[in-house]
């Protein structure tokens, strides 16, 4: 089921399901208990979070609860992460709510370059490929604590040290945590 929560609230109770079905819900704010009440038939029910980059066959797909058929399906188009309980899955839903914020960072940096006289195509190519490379580096190093990359990317009195210090002073990273907490609170009703 891939509809908005408002549409889901309206239509799910009117749909007919069979007990032999496996139902996958992409609906962010309707939990498993609510879905089961709306569906009224005992089915295999899984919540999943496939984000737009899955169209490129890239990215994680958290699923809850674990389900072999659903995992095998999503492993063909991404990287499935099985979450044992719904309470923990809310953390993944919360972080997925930061996708637009990530794109806005890219937009702000590209726009800044454009205002400095760089052609839009060059600005966007530079920023997007820079962040792609940084993300790939983070994936390669994902078994290490990510603070390692923060430390390794700075040189004493260097530009990255300055950038990190300025953003830390302004509470940028605390704001990220506060935003995640607000999204989590909305989902954890």
Q: Across the structure, where does each feature detected by a protein language model lie?
A:
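Transmembrane alpha-helical core positions of polytopic small-molecule transporters
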Residues: 2, 99-103, 155-157
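Internal alpha-helical scaffold of NAD(P)-dependent oxidoreductase catalytic cores
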Residues: 34-44, 59-93, 97-143, 182-187
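NAD(P)-dependent Rossmann-like dehydrogenase/reductase catalytic/cofactor-binding core
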Residues: 128, 132-189
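Short coil/turn residues that cap or connect secondary-structure elements
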Residues: 3, 7, 27, 97, ...
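Rossmann-like NAD(P)(H) cofactor-binding subdomain of soluble oxidoreductases
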Residues: 1-63, 67
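An acidic, carboxylate-rich microenvironment
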Residues: 7-10, 34, 122, 145-148, ...
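Short loop/turn and capping residues at structural boundaries
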Residues: 49, 84-85, 124, 164, ...
